[in-house]
């Protein structure tokens, strides 16, 4: 990338991993953990307000987290398989999820499916539950995007805008290039669009919209969840087109762009097709 001088820019963290003795403390993992707790707390409060048992959110949340991690990693590995199964790659890296690489599509899809069957076994209505937890999920996604900032990943094309993000050259203790686990040398490799920040801000906007729309229109029967999916995928479509990292291409488009369009269309259709009004826990 070019050696362009910028008047202002957003610095990346000098590192994304700290060590407590032999134990690595990864910012990416911490952001995900904080997001999970925030989502569970908000979901518990909202589900209780709808007449549900808040403890169920915690139980279902554990199911969702386990399934989400598996689904997210599977989606990432399948759609970015060239990063793990090439001549110079180490397939063992597939299991190093703390280094980053959780596809949100796979996480939400498998997490949702797992929770659906868990609630069905418990005899609990899925739609009411999904509406209660949807705002917390999008807020958790916003928090999780901070992990990409620490990892210096998922950024956009080079730019000279004042809010551009500086990507530092990081090395490990031996001086080898280590973008995820190393420490910054102070050298700026590139100044790019902070797409992680764009998506984080968009997710915060959707969080506010969900709370507002839910209160104003008394949404129910799965419509809050549908609005969440539609809102998130619309923003992801825009952000995905700004990213510069390697991606699997289908018909000349990034695969996540195609997924965004398809899922958004389904969610919008569901939003208008689902029943109006809000159901009670006993209905």
Swiss-Prot record:
Locations listed in the record: Cell membrane
Enzyme class, UniProt record, top EC level: transferase
Xref: Pfam families: LGT
Recorded metabolic or biological pathway in which this protein acts: Protein modification; lipoprotein biosynthesis (diacylglyceryl transfer)
One GO CC term on file: plasma membrane
InterPro entries (UniProt xref): Lgt (IPR001640)
GO biological process: lipoprotein biosynthetic process
EC number: 2.5.1.145
Keyword annotations of the record: Cell membrane, Membrane, Transferase, Transmembrane, Transmembrane helix
Membrane topology (UniProt): Multi-pass membrane protein
One function term, GO molecular function aspect: phosphatidylglycerol-prolipoprotein diacylglyceryl transferase activity
TM region positions: 20-40, 51-71, 97-117, 123-143, 192-212, 255-275
Binding site for a 1,2-diacyl-sn-glycero-3-phospho-(1'-sn-glycerol): 145
Record function comment: Catalyzes the transfer of the diacylglyceryl group from phosphatidylglycerol to the sulfhydryl group of the N-terminal cysteine of a prolipoprotein, the first step in the formation of mature lipoproteins.
Family: Belongs to the Lgt family.
Alphabetized HAMAP family for the sequence: Lgt
Protein name: Phosphatidylglycerol--prolipoprotein diacylglyceryl transferase
Gene: lgt
């Amino acid at each position: 990338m070019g050696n362009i001088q910028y008047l202002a820019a957003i610095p990346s963290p000098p590192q994304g991993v700290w060590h407590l003795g032999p134990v690595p403390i990864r910012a990416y993992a911490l952001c995900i953990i904080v997001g999970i707790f925030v989502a569970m707390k908000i979901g518990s409060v909202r589900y209780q307000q709808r007449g549900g048992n808040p403890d169920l959110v915690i139980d279902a949340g554990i199911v969702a987290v386990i399934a989400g991690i598996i689904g997210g990693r599977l989606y990432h590995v399948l759609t970015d398989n060239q990063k793990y199964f090439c001549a110079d790659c180490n397939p063992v890296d597939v299991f190093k999820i703390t280094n980053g690489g959780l596809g949100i599509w796979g996480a939400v899809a498998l997490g949702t499916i797992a929770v659906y069957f868990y609630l069905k076994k418990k005899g609990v209505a899925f739609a009411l539950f999904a509406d209660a937890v949807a705002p917390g999920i999008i807020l958790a996604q916003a928090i999780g995007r901070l992990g990409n900032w620490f990892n210096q990943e998922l950024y956009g094309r080079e730019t000279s805008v004042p809010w551009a993000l500086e990507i530092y050259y990081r090395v490990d203790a031996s001086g080898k290039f280590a973008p995820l686990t190393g420490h910054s040398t102070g050298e700026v490799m590139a100044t790019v669009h902070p797409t992680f920040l764009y998506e984080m801000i968009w997710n915060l906007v959707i969080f506010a919209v969900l709370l507002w729309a839910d209160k104003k229109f008394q949404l129910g029967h799965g419509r809050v969840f549908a609005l969440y999916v539609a809102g998130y995928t619309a923003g992801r479509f825009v952000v995905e087109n700004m990213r510069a990292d390697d991606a699997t291409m289908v018909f000349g488009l990034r695969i996540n762009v195609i997924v965004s369009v398809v899922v958004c269309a389904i969610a919008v259709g569901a939003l208008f097709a689902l029943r109006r009004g809000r159901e009670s826990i006993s209905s």
